[in-house]
Curated annotation (Swiss-Prot):
Lineage of the organism: Bacteria, Pseudomonadati, Pseudomonadota, Gammaproteobacteria, Enterobacterales
GO molecular-function term, one example from the UniProt record: metallopeptidase activity
InterPro entries, alphabetized: Metalloenz_LuxS/M16 (IPR011249), Pept_M16_N (IPR011765), Peptidase_M16 (IPR050626), Peptidase_M16_C (IPR007863)
Keywords, in A-Z order: Hydrolase, Metalloprotease, Periplasm, Protease, Signal, Zinc
Gene Ontology annotations of biological process type: proteolysis; response to hydrogen peroxide
UniProt miscellaneous comment: Has lost the active site residues.
Listed SUPFAM superfamilies: LuxS/MPP-like metallohydrolase
Protein name, per record: Protein YhjJ
C-alpha cells in the first residue's frame, strides 16, 4: 500500500525496486513480466520464477477504489464489501473455500486477506507451490468476489457478525501523527476503518459495489513458478466474463504539503521520544532516464549524509541517541525524515549535535574520501546484482512490483539496470553529490516530536530555537529547493533506524 518502503536486500545490495527506471529516454518495461488487458478492461501481469521453484505463488488483485469514493452517507461501504466477500464461498463449495483460505496465507509472512485504503482495495493470496488446483480455485474466488458478490440484508448481517479480517492502510487510521498529516487533505472524513452507518441499506451498498468494482479498474498480478500460458488462459476464462465499466473517474487522493513547524504529538506508537526532522516535495512518476538519474543522485546523497552523521556521533562518543533515516511516497508527496531516538531530557542537546553536523555538510560538503568510499561500496554491491536477484523470493518480487505500480514507476530488466547504474557511478563526482546535499538540506523542515502518551508535553518552541540558531541559512549554502522528483521512497539504500 501507500507509504511502504523497501530496505536493503542480500547483504546491502539494493535490487529490483530500483531496477525500475533505467533506459535512455523512455524506460522500457522488463520483458520478464508478461502483461495484457482483457476485452472488459481488466489488466493482468504474470512473472514466472523458474529460479525459485519452491517459493509460494503470490497473487494480488488490486481494485482502484477505497474510502475516498464514499459520500458521507456511504461511510463504511468500502470496508464492508470485502468483509462480505470473505464470508462467501466465491463460487466454490464451502469446504473448498475454507481450504483455500487455510492454505492461502503464508505462515511465515502472513498478510491480511484484504487491505482497504483511501484509493485502493487489495486482495492477497499466497499459495503453496505446485498446486494448480488451488491456483484455479483462487482465481475463481477472486473473480466472484469482485464481480458476482451477493449483497443482501442477510449476507451483510452475516458478515458484520463474523470476525473482521479486513485490514486498513494505515493500520491505525486514528493514530496521532497520521491525523496530523491529514490536515488540509482530501482524505479527511473518508476513514477506511469507518463502520457502516445505521440503518444499513443493502441496495445502496450493492449500487456502490456495481459502480466501483468494475473490471476496467482492476489489476491482477501473479508471481511464481507457474505455466504462464495456462495461467493467462485461466485469467481469460475466469475474469473475462466480468461486466461493468467505470462511468465516474475515481477521486485522486492528495496530501497537503508538510508544514514547516515544530509540533509534539502524543501517541501509543512509540515508547521513547522520537524527533523527526522532516521535509517533503511533490512526487512525480519515474518513466524516463533523466528522472532516474536525479533520483539516484539524491538517494546516494541521503545515504552519504546518514553515514557521515552516524560516524560523527560515534566519534563524539554520544550516548542515549539513536539515528535513522526514512523516505516514502504518501499520496503524491515524497517525504523524508531524519529520526532521532532520545531520552526526553536530552532532546535539546541531541538535536544540537545532529543539527551541527547537518549544517556542516550543507555548508562545506562531504570530504572526498567519504565520497570515494561510498562509490566504491556501491560498485562492489553492483557486482552482486544477479546473485541478489536469484535470492529475491516471490513475496519480495511481488511487493516491489506493487510499489512500482502505485508510484507509477517503470520496472526494467536487471541487465539494463546494471549498465545504467555502472555508468551513473562512473560519472558521479563529489561536487555533484554535494550540490544535491545542499539542495536537500536547504529545504524548510518540520520538527515532529512523537511522545509516549502520559509524558509531559515538551517545549517545542525551545527545540525550534535550537534548530534555528544552528540551521539559519548560510551564505555559503545553496538556496534552491530539492527537485520535485529527487525523492523516491521504496528504493533507498539508507539503512533502517538503528
Amino acid at each position: 500500500m501507500q507509504g511502504t518502503k523497501i530496505r536493503l536486500l542480500a547483504g546491502g545490495l539494493l535490487m529490483m525496486a530500483t531496477a525500475g527506471y533505467v533506459q535512455a529516454d523512455a524506460l522500457q518495461p522488463d520483458p520478464a513480466w508478461q502483461q495484457g488487458t482483457l476485452s472488459n478492461g481488466l489488466q493482468w501481469q504474470v512473472l514466472t520464477t523458474p529460479q525459485r521453484p519452491s517459493d509460494r505463488v503470490e497473487i494480488r488483485l488490486l481494485v482502484n477504489t477505497g474510502s475516498l469514493a464514499e459520500s458521507t452517507q456511504q461511510s463504511g461501504y468500502s470496508h464492508a464489501i470485502p468483509r462480505i466477500a470473505l464470508t462467501q464461498s466465491g463460487g466454490l463449495d464451502a469446504a473448498q473455500a475454507r481450504s483455500l483460505w487455510q492454505q492461502g496465507i503464508d505462515p511465515k509472512r502472513p498478510m491480511p486477506p484484504v487491505i482497504v485504503s483511501y484509493d485502493t482495495t487489495l486482495f492477497n493470496l499466497s499459495l503453496p507451490n505446485n498446486r494448480n488446483d488451488l491456483l484455479k480455485e483462487a482465481l475463481s474466488y477472486l473473480a466472484n468476489a469482485t464481480g458476482k458478490l451477493t449483497i443482501t440484508p442477510e449476507t451483510i448481517n452475516h458478515a458484520l457478525q463474523s470476525q473482521d479480517m479486513v485490514a486498513t492502510w494505515p493500520a491505525d487510521t486514528k493514530e496521532g501523527w497520521w491525523r496530523y498529516r491529514l490536515k488540509g487533505s482530501t482524505l479527511l472524513g473518508h476513514d477506511p476503518a469507518d463502520p457502516l452507518k445505521q440503518p444499513v441499506e443493502a441496495e445502496k451498498i450493492k449500487d456502490f459495489y456495481q459502480k466501483w468494482y468494475t473490471p476496467d479498474a482492476m489489476t491482477l498480478l501473479v508471481v511464481g513458478n507457474v505455466d504462464a500460458r495456462s495461467v493467462v488462459d485461466q485469467i481469460n476464462k475466469t475474469f473475462g466474463e466480468l461486466k461493468g465499466k467505470r462511468e465516474t473517474p475515481a477521486p485522486v487522493p492528495t496530501l497537503s504539503p508538510l508544514r514547516a513547524e515544530a509540533v509534539s504529538i502524543m501517541t501509543d506508537a512509540v515508547r521513547q521520544d522520537r524527533l523527526s526532522i522532516m521535509w517533503d516535495t511533490p512526487w512525480q512518476p519515474i518513466r524516463e532516464s533523466a528522472a532516474l538519474l536525479r533520483y539516484w543522485r539524491a538517494d546516494l546523497a541521503r545515504e552519504a549524509l546518514f553515514w557521515h552523521v552516524q560516524q560523527a556521533l560515534s566519534a563524539s562518543n554520544s550516548k542515549d541517541i539513536g539515528l535513522g533515516f526514512d523516505c516514502r511516497v504518501l499520496y503524491l508527496r515524497a517525504q523524508c525524515a531524519i529520526n532521532i531516538e532520545s531520552p526526553n531530557d536530552k532532546l535539546n542537546s541531541n538535536l544540537n549535535l545532529v543539527a551541527r553536523e547537518l549544517a556542516k555538510v550543507r555548508d562545506k560538503g562531504l570530504p572526498e574520501e567519504e565520497f570515494n568510499a561510498l562509490v566504491a561500496q556501491k560498485k562492489l554491491e553492483l557486482q552482486k546484482l544477479f546473485a541478489a536477484y536469484a535470492r529475491a523470493d516471490t513475496d519480495i518480487l511481488m511487493g516491489q512490483r506493487m510499489r512500482s505500480l502505485q508510484n507509477q514507476v517503470v520496472d526494467i530488466a536487471p541487465e539494463q539496470y546494471q549498465k545504467l547504474r555502472q555508468d551513473f557511478l562512473n560519472s558521479l563526482t563529489v561536487e555533484m553529490l554535494n550540490q544535491d546535499l545542499r539542495q536537500q538540506l536547504s529545504n524548510d523542515m518540520a520538527l515532529i516530536l512523537l511522545q509516549p502518551k502520559g509524558e509531559p508535553e515538551f517545549n517545542m518552541k525551545a527545540l525550534q530555537a535550537v534548530w534555528d540558531q544552528i540551521m539559519a541559512p548560510s551564505t555559503a549554502a545553496a538556496t534552491t529547493s530539492v527537485a520535485t522528483d529527487d525523492v523516491h521512497p521504496e528504493v533507498t539504500d539508507i539503512p533502517p533506524a538503528q
